[in-house]
From Swiss-Prot:
Protein's name according to its UniProt entry: UPF0173 metal-dependent hydrolase Rsph17029_0942
MF terms (GO), sorted A to Z: hydrolase activity
Keywords: Hydrolase
Domain of life: Bacteria
Organism: Cereibacter sphaeroides (strain ATCC 17029 / ATH 2.4.9)
Keyword Hydrolase: yes
SMART domains: Lactamase_B
Any Pfam family: Lactamase_B_2
Family: Belongs to the UPF0173 family.
Length: 230
């Protein structure tokens, strides 16, 4: 299994026979090198989105049309994109599980907000979500944009993820200290990868507080387009 950061909250996850592009905001992403776009997209099988905000949907429609990839996410958002943009999609909802190239992806709760920008104002796109991605003997908890929430308790107990990809840059999501607290209290991770940080000055620029708060856990600060093998 390989997890590759695309900057901000974007990832390329190669698991089982699937290559998932998660929240692929590439164009205009200060951390993503535009001249390496093909490297990020090569072999992708699905696009997995957590919610409707532009720094997460980003290049979703362009990539879906260019590569013929299905967009996977919460029903309201995927249905709206299908109707407006004519793309393929797999819409489901909290508690539902879909199998993507042998990987089992279950949608779970997050606490944030979700909308897309429209000419007349924000467009409702369902609610925000996270995912449990199971395959190759591992379970990844992809938090999506979220703060700490009590639901993490049963999510950790039921799904037992060993890898956490946690939004932890603060301001719009939990910060590094809160993410460390959530990981300690609700999960038993072997590996934690922070995201949604370093992109803008108002976000946290380092994961040191996360590392300090998780002794005994491997906290990996991702580098853009450098695969992490699990």
């Amino acid at each position: 299994m390989k997890i590759t950061w695309l900057g901000h909250s974007g990832f390329r996850i190669a698991i089982e026979q699937a290559v998932l592009l998660v929240d692929p905001w590439l164009t205009g992403n200060p951390l993503f090198p535009a001249d390496r776009r093909e490297e990020a997209l090569a072999g992708a099988t699905h696009i997995l989105i957590t919610h409707g905000h532009g720094d997460h949907t980003g290049d979703t429609v362009a990539i879906a049309k260019e590569r013929g990839l299905p967009v996977v996410g919460i029903y309201d958002l995927v249905t709206w994109l299908q109707e407006k943009e004519g793309i393929d999609g797999i819409g489901f909802n909290k508690g539902g599980t879909v199998t993507l190239g042998g990987a089992r992806v279950t949608m779970v709760q997050a606490t944030h907000s979700s909308s897309m920008s429209g000419e007349a104002g924000p467009i409702y796109t369902g609610t925000e979500s996270g995912y449990m991605i199971a395959g190759e003997g591992h379970v990844i908890y992809l938090s999506g944009d979220t703060d700490i929430m009590a639901d993490m308790g049963w999510m950790g107990e039921y799904h037992r993820p060993d890898v956490g990809i946690l939004s932890a840059g603060g301001h719009f999501t939990m910060d590094m200290k809160r993410a460390a607290f959530a990981a300690r209290r609700y999960f038993d991770f072997r590996t934690v990868i922070p995201c949604h940080y370093r992109t803008f000055p108002l976000l946290e620029q380092s994961a040191e507080a996360l590392k300090e708060g998780l002794p005994g856990v491997e906290v990996i600060e991702p580098q853009v387009l450098v695969p992490i093998e699990i």
